[in-house]
């Protein structure tokens, strides 16, 4: 299971380091101190992950087993690539048998077993390129996409929710029956139309706040489990569940 990191690391660095006063603004210095002293950042370096976000996925998987049995995975908003690193391992993806496709408009350094597309997911050609890259029907669609923040919470929420909606629509179009969809969202309410669509197409829908998400962050994750398939026009399922986890 994914365990909470300890307060020290093997390099001897201790939590609580201060950043020397330079020309950095106070807010930038506080962010840098928090980043340096973040135990998940330190653990990511020790375990070879590109970002602390790896532990969010691992923590969610510990409880919900969304990676179990996955044979092909698509990672949206993948930079710098920690989720794709995990996906490559669980699918046994190799350069000769690619089973993971990742997309981001930012550059991503190569990851063994991952086909990387440097492209905006909102580009009309992106869905077809992803499906060609992954080489088959995915069991899991991951989205860590978030719009650049403006500092205006309502605007940031609306923009990120749009990305979540586009990702959800893509997942419903491409997932294998029984597959799962996981996407970043922000606190502030998920649009009813999106929740209704997910509950029509998946057996269970949950909001999750992993312990590895910073406590002050408005970030949450929307998990839709057990895709019902595309063989019939979806109807509202009274048994579909929706819940929120801490």
Curated annotation (Swiss-Prot):
Show the Pfam families listed in the entry. FtsJ
> What does the entry list as the binding residues for S-adenosyl-L-methionine?
81, 83, 104, 120, 144
Does the record bear Ribonucleoprotein in its keywords? Answer: no
* Top enzyme category: transferase
Q: Which residues does the Swiss-Prot or TrEMBL record annotate as the active site?
A: 184
| Catalytic activity of the protein | uridine(2552) in 23S rRNA + S-adenosyl-L-methionine = 2'-O-methyluridine(2552) in 23S rRNA + S-adenosyl-L-homocysteine + H(+)
EC numbers for this chain:
2.1.1.166
Where it mainly occurs, coarsely classed, is cytoplasm
Q: Which GO terms describe its cellular component?
A: cytoplasm
Write the record's keywords in alphabetical order, separated by commas: Cytoplasm, Methyltransferase, rRNA processing, S-adenosyl-L-methionine, Transferase
Please tell me whether the keyword NADP is annotated for this protein: no
Report the subcellular localization: Cytoplasm
- Recorded family membership: Belongs to the class I-like SAM-binding methyltransferase superfamily. RNA methyltransferase RlmE family.
Describe the task this protein carries out: Specifically methylates the uridine in position 2552 of 23S rRNA at the 2'-O position of the ribose in the fully assembled 50S ribosomal subunit.
- According to UniProt, the name of this protein is Ribosomal RNA large subunit methyltransferase E
**UniProt organism field:** Agrobacterium fabrum (strain C58 / ATCC 33970) (Agrobacterium tumefaciens (strain C58))
